[in-house]
């Protein structure tokens, strides 16, 4: 699964947890869908067995992604090796050693999430200059050995955007997350030209995936891709 520039921009809908979510995602037809696995604090949490059951009805055209937060390496590898998921997305404090140990199990496609610095961190001159904070962060993201990086405002699924101009520091393809949805997705694509977009809470109503919002979000990205040709 090679990573090239997002042409067309790829689409990932994340946080599926119910059979009806699978019905909706099959209708919307994004490129990827995400399952949050073994993260009890998430309202979208699923168990490996739940994902296996949901996966059976997922369209083969949609690539399933497992989203993890500091999960034991062997558990992630097991789900990749048995085909439950095809991509591992790391959303915790996983480091280069973690990625190295995961790759020892096989040739896997790995996405590593990075939290974009908040204004208070950037302006905290007591520790580092704003320029140093940004350069250190960008250097870490650019040097990640993951196949793809994801930029978010925090732990994922918060529905809040980050300062988009900071993404200009990244010199590699990236997946854009954090408050991206039907209402602002065209603006985000025009400004940042990401490899792909990752949406979760923005395609929900009352904490549940919303079929109409999922269809609208995917439709707007497809339209943007078509107009870009």
Residue ranges and their predicted role:
Residues 24-30, 58:
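A short, Lys/Arg-enriched amphipathic alpha-helix followed by its capping loop at the start of a domain
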Residues 29, 84, 145, 192-193:
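Short loop/turn motifs at secondary-structure junctions
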Residues 111, 175, 195-198, 205, ...:
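A generic "structured core" feature
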């Amino acid at each position: 699964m090679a990573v090239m520039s997002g042409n067309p921009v790829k689409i990932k809908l994340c946080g599926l947890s119910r059979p009806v979510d699978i019905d909706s995602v099959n209708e919307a037809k994004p490129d990827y869908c995400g399952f949050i696995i073994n993260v009890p604090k998430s309202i979208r949490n699923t168990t490996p067995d739940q994902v296996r059951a949901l996966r059976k009805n997922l369209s083969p055209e949609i690539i399933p992604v497992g989203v993890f937060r500091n999960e034991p390496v062997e558990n992630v590898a097991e789900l990749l090796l048995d085909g439950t998921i095809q991509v591992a997305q790391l959303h915790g404090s996983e480091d280069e050693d973690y990625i190295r140990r995961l790759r020892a199990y096989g040739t896997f496609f790995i996405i590593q999430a990075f939290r974009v610095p908040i204004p208070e961190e950037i302006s905290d001159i007591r520790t580092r200059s704003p320029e140093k904070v940004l350069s250190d962060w960008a250097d870490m993201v650019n040097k990640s050995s993951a196949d793809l990086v994801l930029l978010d405002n925090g732990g994922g699924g918060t529905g809040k955007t980050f300062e988009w101009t900071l993404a200009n520091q990244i010199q590699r393809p990236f997946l854009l997350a954090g408050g991206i949805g039907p209402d602002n997705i065209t603006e985000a694509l025009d400004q940042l030209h990401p490899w792909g977009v990752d949406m979760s809470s923005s395609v929900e109503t009352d904490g549940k995936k919303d079929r109409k919002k999922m269809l609208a979000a995917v439709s707007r990205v497809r339209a943007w891709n078509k107009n870009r040709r």
